[in-house]
Swiss-Prot record:
Disulfide links within the chain: none
EC numbers on record: 2.4.2.9
Protein name: Uracil phosphoribosyltransferase
Native organism taxonomy: Bacteria, Bacillati, Bacillota, Bacilli, Bacillales
Organism whose genome encodes this protein: Geobacillus kaustophilus (strain HTA426)
Name of the encoding gene: upp
Residues annotated as binding 5-phospho-alpha-D-ribose 1-diphosphate: 79, 104, 131-139, 200
Catalysed reaction, written as an equation: UMP + diphosphate = 5-phospho-alpha-D-ribose 1-diphosphate + uracil
Length: 209
């Protein structure tokens, strides 16, 4: 059964405050998202398995621990998810990066895939899907669907800010997926924005609308 993890680390919460602030400019916003993604990656990789190897220090031989050959994949949901990728790769530079692009069908209002590019060894990798916002949950559910449809068996979802509605949607559709968030906000407004939220993450990351 999937779990929901809310990271209340002081550094994450401090930086998240400035990410939320409407007066934070594009450059600083981008840097802060990158930094928070790195801090969250530190926590999300806490359960990686370790194995012992023998090394030689300048003083003697020793047994030491290394990550046990886990293959990781980072999957940003386009476009805003791109802003979190480099922060994660700072800690796990060997991870492969895929991309999932979705748009909302104007008739059904449901997410539709327009681009999916994944590592060739999908079934062998542990995936982290990243998107700054988990609002209605539609994009997150669709992205997880896309990965599972192509053979992925181990998936985590990571975002900066989530609404209860989005968390519930992911839990209902994919109860096996753990959700990692920096803040769980109050609700969605009538326009589908998270309250208090941070606005449109993609617009603020890239300076475009």
């Amino acid at each position: 059964m999937g779990k929901v993890y809310v990271f209340d680390h002081p550094l994450i919460q401090h930086k998240l405050t400035y990410i939320r602030d409407k007066n934070t400019g594009t450059k600083e916003f981008r840097e802060l998202v990158d930094e928070v993604a790195t801090l969250m990656a530190f926590e999300i990789t806490r359960d990686l398995p370790l194995e012992e190897v023998e090394i030689e220090t300048p003083v003697s031989k020793a047994r030491a621990k290394v990550i046990a050959g886990k293959k990781l994949g980072v999957i940003p949901i386009l476009r805003a998810g791109i802003g979190m990728v480099d922060g994660i790769l700072k800690l796990i530079p060997a991870a492969k990066v895929g991309h999932i692009g979705l748009y909302r069908d104007p008739q059904t209002l449901k997410p539709v895939e327009y681009y999916v590019k994944l590592p060739s060894d999908v079934e062998e990798r542990d995936f982290i899907i990243v998107d700054p916002m988990l609002a209605t949950g539609g994009s997150a559910v669709a992205a997880i669907d896309a990965l599972k449809k192509r053979g992925a068996k181990s998936i985590k979802f990571m975002c900066l800010i989530a609404a209860p509605e989005g968390v519930k949607a992911v839990e209902t559709a994919h109860p096996d997926v753990d959700i990692y968030i920096a803040a769980l906000d109050e609700r969605l407004n009538d326009h589908g924005y998270i309250v208090p939220g941070l606005g449109d993450a993609g617009d603020r990351l890239f300076g475009t609308k």
